[in-house]
């Protein structure tokens, strides 16, 4: 009798977090539809083509998903190894963008590098790098972070260099986001409450001084406090955004039927996309988007907790840092649009128009998916080991 043929080995499956995937695809889809709705008139003005911006955004999303697929294949141990050199690369990029003739200047700020036809906003790259760097630092120096204020100050000194370079662009909003990411990660990394609170007070004081040191920031603050008094100058953008939400009421005026995007509301397809959504989809659409971002943050923290329970501290901290970044930036963008916060110039993650930011954020989400996959595989291998 011939020997029995060996049983085929089961195909290896890449476990994807279905909840997180659904949320990301919904945000990308809603964002694309709203970018299309808010930019058609601009496409006619720029290129006599209503599909000019929607087509470019579709290309950005496809490139972002391709980049995410590549990032998904990188094990977390490699990110842990390259955290420090990656931070140096980030500082170099922040310096390069300030070189006259190299950095691309838009609306008075030099924040972009042109690469293969795409404008890469260096601050978005630096946010991701800061997450990886901080996760590596806290993992290596866990005792110092927990028991010494100098353990908290060391990485912040390096991040302050990045923040100064960002302020030179100027990009105050991104500098704030990076510091919030760092502080949040150190708190979740086990920093003692008393030195942490003292550090928060120090950084907040420094931020307040910086915010009041530039005339345009002071104007933003005064217009935020009473936008209707400055409705024709510094408060114009905010009042137009508030009008958008007022017109939208509960169910909106209908997709594509908004008026504020028609050259009344500046940056309607980028920083103020949420206002257009509020006008056209109303409270229903606004609530849906807030719920999606809330789900993303909650699910991201859950993945971080699973990684920490599995002993993968670096991966856990990266997960925490990524969701702090996405959650805080989304909160600030929506808060600015609704008049809760002063204007900051931050995009709505995975939704606003933009090539470089879309690619970076898709890549960042891929890292979160990778953490979930590795934790799931580790859990499966532990179960198999116990059953033997």
Swiss-Prot record:
Localization: Cell inner membrane
UniProt membrane topology term: Multi-pass membrane protein
Name by which UniProt lists this protein: Probable peptidoglycan glycosyltransferase FtsW
GO molecular function: lipid-linked peptidoglycan transporter activity; peptidoglycan glycosyltransferase activity
Catalytic activity: [GlcNAc-(1->4)-Mur2Ac(oyl-L-Ala-gamma-D-Glu-L-Lys-D-Ala-D-Ala)](n)-di-trans,octa-cis-undecaprenyl diphosphate + beta-D-GlcNAc-(1->4)-Mur2Ac(oyl-L-Ala-gamma-D-Glu-L-Lys-D-Ala-D-Ala)-di-trans,octa-cis-undecaprenyl diphosphate = [GlcNAc-(1->4)-Mur2Ac(oyl-L-Ala-gamma-D-Glu-L-Lys-D-Ala-D-Ala)](n+1)-di-trans,octa-cis-undecaprenyl diphosphate + di-trans,octa-cis-undecaprenyl diphosphate + H(+)
Alphabetical list of InterPro entries matching this protein: FtsW (IPR013437), FtsW/RodA (IPR001182)
One Pfam short name: FTSW_RODA_SPOVE
Positions of transmembrane segments: 20-40, 58-78, 86-106, 118-137, 148-168, 171-191, 193-213, 272-292, 316-336, 349-369
